[in-house]
Structure formats: C-alpha cells, structure tokens
C-alpha cells in the first residue's frame, strides 16, 4: 500500500515553541525515530496495538545553498540579529529564541555538582535548620502546581521537589477536586525524607481564599484529614517577574540566588519556554503553561531580594544544533 506520512517545517520561537520542542526536539537526538504505542479496543472486545513514529531532522540556512547563492546578503542579515534571534534563525537553536522572558536561564549538566553558572543542579541533603516553603497554584481543567523550596542562610532558594497535576499532555489538568489535591500534597510530604517532619510554610494563589461562591478552596484543603494550611501569596505580577530576574542573575562566582534540582522536570520544561505577551509587553503571555511560574512567583514574593550586580556568564561550548549536548541555554 501507499505509505502515508506528514512533513512539517518550522522555526524556533513563538507561543508554540515549547510544544514543538517537547514533542520533537527533547525526546531523542536528531535523526532518531521516536515511536509511541497506542492501544485501541475493537468492537469484538479485543485490543489492538498501534504505533506512530516521528523524527526531528535539524536544518539551517547552510543546508540551502541555492538561497545563499540567490541572496548573498541574507546570511549577513541573520548574523546581525539580536543574539537570541540569531541563535534560533541562523543556527537553529531551540534553546534561545525571540520573545523568551528568562534569557538568563542556563541548564548545564556539566556543572550540576559544583553548582556554578547553572540554574539546574544535582539534589543534595537539605540541612534541618533551613526554612521550607510550599508554593501552590490551583488548577482543575488546567494543571495544578505545587513546588517545595528550601532557603539557605544567605537567602538563596532551591526548588527541591514538585508535584504537577497534569495528564501527561502539556497544559491538560487531572480534573481532581481540592480535597484530593490536598491529600496528594500531604502524602508527598509524608513520604519524602527531605520534607517529612518539617515545618512547611504554604504560600498560595490568593484566589483560593475566595468565598463568594461557597466554601473556599483553602478551607476545603484545611479540613481533616489533610490539615493543609496556606497563606495568601502576593500576586503582583510585574514585581514577581522581576524577582525571577533578580534571582536568576549570576554573581561573580557563578552563583545565582535561585536553583532547581534536576528532578523538577516540569519546571525545567516550562520556565525557559515562557514568552512575552504581545499586548502587555512587560508581562508573560498567560495563554501558556504558566502554572509553575505562578506558584514559584508567590514564594519569591514571600522572600524578595534587591536588584543584584549583573555578571556575565562564560560562553557555552559551540553546539548550535544540540548534536552533542542535549541541554544548553543562552544568556542574553
């Protein structure tokens, strides 16, 4: 029979950037088929296993000599763009793109252990005297997000654990009620050695305290047997975004004021992909998967810091198509 397939082309950037990257770029090295298996129940009650495959084929302007020959100035036009756009459109990088909010973000696996010049680090044992915070953004049809944070003696925050209520599809929630969400949060804290037995300060979206339509979400979560308590977070959006920028900045020793355990996969997946709102250019586009961002923002606003002195991070190794290293982020 006829082989049916689809070819799709795109450039990095835009609101769909994160979806394309998660589906085609991140799961496997370039040129490696990604196969998914599906089960279909037939009318006679039997089940049939079906497969779908996809593959990412990297390409850049250098693969189109005809275009370069017809328009010799095109290469110079791409090279003259701002750094983020140049990396995306000239070199095909999916880790840096126009409109990216947190251009400071860096994820360098080679530095996970020494914790320098990277925001993602290897997990470590949290000292008993460190304060623990729990951030929460409620969701039903959209994901709910819970993040646990440890604060060291210098005020540096570490995201040490997360609970993200999604189906496995980006931005699709589990549709579970507040009581069940509270049960899962309490269970996570009781079963994790980093959290068990600690005093945890919960900070949440102030909307969960709304009683205009009956019992509030906060009250439901505080009931027996979960006894989960929250304080309303500061929801000032632009000030919260600036706290992100302040904390992501590296000092002269390569240490930021905010780092993330590499086990927090959904934070690492969603935060670098956030883009600006075209209508409100100082804020992020809220149509994105921004639930982790919101939940983290409440915790940062509970622990505000002053604007730091900016220090430039060292350049990453040149690997624009990610052929040898699967995680690199440019700081603009």
Segments the model singles out, each with a brief description of its role:
Residues 18-19, 143-147, 210-217:
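A short acidic (Asp/Glu
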Residues 155-288, 304-311, 315-332:
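Mg2+-dependent endonuclease catalytic cores in nucleic-acid-processing enzymes, primarily RNase H-like
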Residues 64-136:
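ATPase catalytic-site recognition across NTP-hydrolyzing enzymes
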Residues 5-8, 145-155, 180:
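A short alpha/beta connector and helix-capping loop motif
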Residues 127-151:
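Gly/Thr-rich phosphate-binding beta-strand-loop-beta motif of the actin/hexokinase/Hsp70
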Residues 1-64:
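ASCE P-loop NTPase helicase motor core
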